[in-house]
Amino acid sequence: MCSSDLKCYTSTGSYVLEAGEYQISLRTDSHTVKDNLTMTCKVAENEVFQDSAFGSGVENCKYVGKRSSDEVVATNQFDDAAGDVAYLNRDTWQIVPGTSKEATAEQLEAFNNALVVDDSYVDADDTAPTFGAKNGLTLKDMEGLAYDDAQWDKLLDQLTLDDMYKLLGADGWGSAAVDNIGKGQTYEMDGPAALSYVFDAFMGTCTYKTVTYPAEVLLAATWNVDLASEFGDAISQEGKAWNISGWYAPGANTHRNAFAGRNFEYYSEDGFLSGSMSAATVGAAEKNGMYCYIKHFALNERETWRHYGLCTWADEQAMREIYFVPFEKAVKEGGSTAVMSSYNNIGTTWAGASTALLTNVLRNEWGFIGTVITDNNEEHGFMDIEKAVLAGGTNLLFGWGTKTFDNLSQTATGQLKMREAAHQYLY
C-alpha cells in the first residue's frame, strides 16, 4: 500500500490515490538515479478518500473514507477563492499569461460586495457562560488534562470578561498574567532564524545576545530532518535560558519564485520537504515546552502589499497539494499547538477571519487544538479580532488601537465564542 502522501486532490473535491505503478528512486539530482536505488509501489485501484455517497466522478474506484490522519473527510472549502483565472493543467500547457488590465466597474462592484462579511453572532438558544467563579483552580492544575476534561470548564468559569480582553485582545511578544486562574506572564519572540529581539514593555532593555542560526532555506537544502530536529531542540533550550515560552516560527510558506520578499524565512518550493523540516523543528521544540507559531497561515507567498488587503487567488488543488502541506505536517507530525495567521485575503476573505481555513480545515479536519494568533496588528482596519474569534482564531498580535470586543461581549453567543478562544489559548 502506497503512502497517502502520494495522493492528489481532485477538482471534484476529494483526495485520490490513483491506480498504477509508482517508481520511487534515490537520486543525486533530478535526472540521475543513485546506484539503481529504486522501488516500485503498486496501487490496484483508485482510492477515493471520501464516503461512497459523495460521488467523486472517479471511475473504477474504492471509497475509503477520510484519510487516517484526518478527523473528518476533506471537501472543498475555498471554491470562492479560485477567481476568474485561467489555470494551467495537463490539457492547457499553452496558456500564456495575459498582460495586466484594469478592473471594470462591474468587477469592482462584485469584488466590493464579496468583501462584506456576515457579522451575525447571536443564537437565541445560547446561554451566557459563568464569569468570576471562585473554584480555587489554577492553570497549573490543568497540566496533563485532556482538552475536553470537565476541570477546564471550572477553570474557565473563574475568568472575567476583563480577563478575556487581556488574553485575547492584548497579546504580542507574550501574554499578561491573569490572577484569577494563577496564570503568570509569558514571553514570546520572533523569528525563524533566531530568538531575535524583545520589546522594552515586557522585558526591559535587551542586554543579552542570542544565537543566530542559518536561514531555513539552507536547512532545507540539507534534506536532513535530524538536523532540523536539532535546530528545534537548540532554540527551545535557549528559550528556557531566557524564559521564552513561545516562538513566532518556523516560517512555512512556499517559494513561488526566486524574488519573494521573505524566501529566507521559508524552506523551499516543495510542500513535502518544507513540511518535513517544519514538523521536525516544531516537534523537538514542543518537547522542551516551547510552543511554535508556524506562520503565515496561509498563502502568504507575496510580501508586497500583503498587509494592505492583498487578495490571493488559488484553486483548492494548489492549496492542498502545495501551500497547506507544510502547515499540515507541522500540525499532524510535529504536534504544533500554535499557528500565526496571515495578513492576506484568501479570495476576498481575510485569512485571519476565514472560518473555512481556521475552523473547517485547521481544527475540524486536521484536529488542531491550540492558539491561532494574528500577524502583527499595525492599525490595519481589516484585522478585526471579533471576526477572527468567530472564525476560529484566538488572539491579536498587539492589541492596540480600536480592536475591541464591544459586540461579542454583549451577547451570550459572543461570550461563548470568547470563552472557547480563551480555552484554546490556555490549553
Describe the role of every protein-language-model region:
Residues 1-8, 18-26, 30-32, 54-427:
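Glycoside hydrolase catalytic-domain context in secreted enzymes
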Residues 32-58:
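Short beta-strand elements
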Residues 12-14:
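Short consensus segments that form the blades of beta-propeller domains
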